[in-house]
Amino acid sequence: MSPSAGLQFSLYFLQTKKVLWKLTDKEKGLCYILLFTLCFFADQENGGKALASPPGIWKRADVTFDSNTAFSSLVVSANKKTVKNVGVPQVVPDNPERFNSSPCVLGSPGFRSGKHYFEVKYGTQREWAVGIAGKSVKRKGNLMLVPEERIWQMGLWWLRHLETDPGRVHSTSGKITVFVDYNGGNVIFDLNRINTTLKANFNGEEVVPFFYLGGTVSLTTL
């Protein structure tokens, strides 16, 4: 069984432990076997990954990076589908749209209604975050990656939380999918086939894809 199904089994166990403790040892054993089997088959039916897609119909967004907003050490590819932190400030104009203190970049298109999603490929590097931000997000000065700053994000920090050692660097590449339910006020992240939902109050403001790249990180939109 793949690690994702094993993790899913653990999560189901934690969610049902309040019921399981009331059962006899024999009944508990049967429940454990049933949960394990269900997770295994869910894993196999989705090509070795536990199912974790949010319900509903979502419109795929073809996201590109906006080089006019990119921090000086972030280099956007010619096709605007990849961005890399080269670690050295480049000579770029300090226009009002550009982040000047935090290694961030925004993307397009923006969203004002409906249900949308976009996918981003990440590598083995550390310190990155992907999400959305209000179009009015602060560009100058230090930036906190929190909803109070109009930013809803998920990234390597969450992956570290899943590890036994909180300081251990995640060593595999993968994909993160961001679902934006504008009217419902939800931002849903599918990372490692586990969904995490953040409640959001957009206040009618347009929101755009948001990316943070610390260290020598590169991200590619799919």
Swiss-Prot record:
<dbReference type="InterPro" id="IPR006574">
    <property type="entry name" value="PRY"/>
</dbReference>
<keyword id="KW-0964">Secreted</keyword>
<keyword id="KW-0732">Signal</keyword>
<feature type="propeptide">
    <location>
        <begin position="45"/>
        <end position="52"/>
    </location>
</feature>
<comment type="similarity">
    <text>Belongs to the ohanin/vespryn family.</text>
</comment>
<comment type="function">
    <text>Neurotoxin that produces dose-dependent hypolocomotion and hyperalgesia in mice. May directly act on the central nervous system, as it is 6500-fold more potent when administered intracerebroventricularly than intraperitoneal.</text>
</comment>
<dbReference type="GO" id="GO:0005576">
    <property type="term" value="C:extracellular region"/>
</dbReference>
<dbReference type="InterPro" id="IPR003877">
    <property type="entry name" value="SPRY_dom"/>
</dbReference>
<dbReference type="InterPro" id="IPR001870">
    <property type="entry name" value="B30.2/SPRY"/>
</dbReference>
<keyword id="KW-0800">Toxin</keyword>
<protein>
    <recommendedName>
        <fullName>Vespryn</fullName>
    </recommendedName>
</protein>
<feature type="signal peptide">
    <location>
        <begin position="1"/>
        <end position="44"/>
    </location>
</feature>
<feature type="domain" description="B30.2/SPRY">
    <location>
        <begin position="53"/>
        <end position="159"/>
    </location>
</feature>
<feature type="glycosylation site" description="N-linked (GlcNAc...) asparagine">
    <location>
        <position position="195"/>
    </location>
</feature>
<dbReference type="InterPro" id="IPR050143">
    <property type="entry name" value="TRIM/RBCC"/>
</dbReference>
<keyword id="KW-0325">Glycoprotein</keyword>
<dbReference type="Pfam" id="PF00622">
    <property type="entry name" value="SPRY"/>
</dbReference>
<dbReference type="InterPro" id="IPR043136">
    <property type="entry name" value="B30.2/SPRY_sf"/>
</dbReference>
<dbReference type="InterPro" id="IPR013320">
    <property type="entry name" value="ConA-like_dom_sf"/>
</dbReference>
<dbReference type="GO" id="GO:0090729">
    <property type="term" value="F:toxin activity"/>
</dbReference>
<keyword id="KW-0528">Neurotoxin</keyword>
<dbReference type="InterPro" id="IPR003879">
    <property type="entry name" value="Butyrophylin_SPRY"/>
</dbReference>
<dbReference type="Pfam" id="PF13765">
    <property type="entry name" value="PRY"/>
</dbReference>
<feature type="propeptide">
    <location>
        <begin position="160"/>
        <end position="222"/>
    </location>
</feature>
